[in-house]
Swiss-Prot record:
Subcellular location: Cytoplasm
Record's keyword terms, sorted: Cytoplasm, DNA-binding, Transcription, Transcription regulation
Family that this chain belongs to: Belongs to the TACO1 family.
Protein name according to UniProt: Probable transcriptional regulatory protein BRE_29
Lineage, highest ranks first: Bacteria, Pseudomonadati, Spirochaetota, Spirochaetia, Spirochaetales
GO biological process, one term: regulation of DNA-templated transcription
Example of a GO cellular component annotation carried by this entry: cytosol
Domain of life: Bacteria
GO MF annotation list: DNA binding
Transcription regulation listed as a keyword: yes
Length: 243
């Protein structure tokens, strides 16, 4: 078991959730509804829906909102057809970005993403130009205020986890993308996770000084503010106390 989590800075800290709550909720509702429409409204038998609902719970979305989003999806009242898009790009200083989008208008989304990048000094890359720098991993996180660390570790290893990281009041179980569902299902029989998702993890990270890091984080924030952007993965080394 490793002592320090390599996951703690994979995705940029979003700051105060309240400031962006409406935008975040809108994106999550869309994701939940589409997952329900594609795979049904049963969370236990629809992995994509389960992941979407878990994200909503982490964001403190009210249960009523989640249920309405599921009903909207299975009722097929969504209107427009939605598409999943992935853009590979570069921010400043060679930082690689993978931008995951969910949209009902491909041209609008492409224009918005391209505009943010060009105005900020970044650029879109060709397919494959960035994706080779990342690999998929499963992340399942637990709060140690609720459970005993040794019990989580024991069951996680028995279930086939690749690694386990302990930091502060959190234990993070790492799995392969293929084993994520089976490991998380086994752990769920005894523990309720705080986070459960499949994410893109960089093979290595780019270290910058504070001024450079802040510029890159500003680009990521602008991309995340786009209505159609669901996730922005990057290989920036984020250091909170950098001088």
């Amino acid at each position: 078991m490793s002592g320090h989590s390599k996951w703690s800075t994979i995705k940029r800290k979003k700051g105060t959730l309240d400031a962006k709550r409406n935008k975040i909720f809108t994106k999550l509702i869309r994701e939940i509804s589409i997952a329900a429409r594609m795979g049904g409204g049963d969370i236990d038998s629809n992995p994509r829906l389960r992941l979407a609902v878990n994200k909503a719970r982490v964001a403190n979305m009210p249960k009523d909102n989640i249920e309405k989003a599921i009903k909207k999806g299975i009722g097929d009242n969504m209107g427009s057809e939605y598409f999943k898009l992935t853009y590979e790009a570069y921010a400043l200083y060679g930082v690689a970005l993978i931008i995951k989008c969910l949209t009902d208008n491909k041209n609008r989304t492409a224009s918005e993403v391209r505009s943010v990048l060009s105005k900020s000094g970044g650029s879109l890359g060709a397919p494959g130009s960035v994706s080779y720098m990342f690999h998929k991993k499963g992340l399942i996180s637990y709060n140690l205020d609720k459970y005993h660390e040794d019990e989580i570790i024991e069951l996680a290893l028995e279930a086939g986890a690749e690694d386990i990281y302990s930091e502060g009041s959190q234990v993070e179980v790492i799995t392969s993308a293929d084993n994520f569902e089976s490991v998380s299902s086994i752990l769920r029989t005894k523990f309720e996770e705080d986070i459960a998702e499949v994410a893109l993890v960089p093979e290595s990270k780019v270290a910058l000084d504070k001024e450079q890091m802040d510029k890159v984080l500003a680009i990521i924030e602008k991309l995340e503010d786009c209505d159609d952007v669901q996730e922005v993965y990057h290989n920036l080394e984020i250091v909170d106390d950098i001088c």
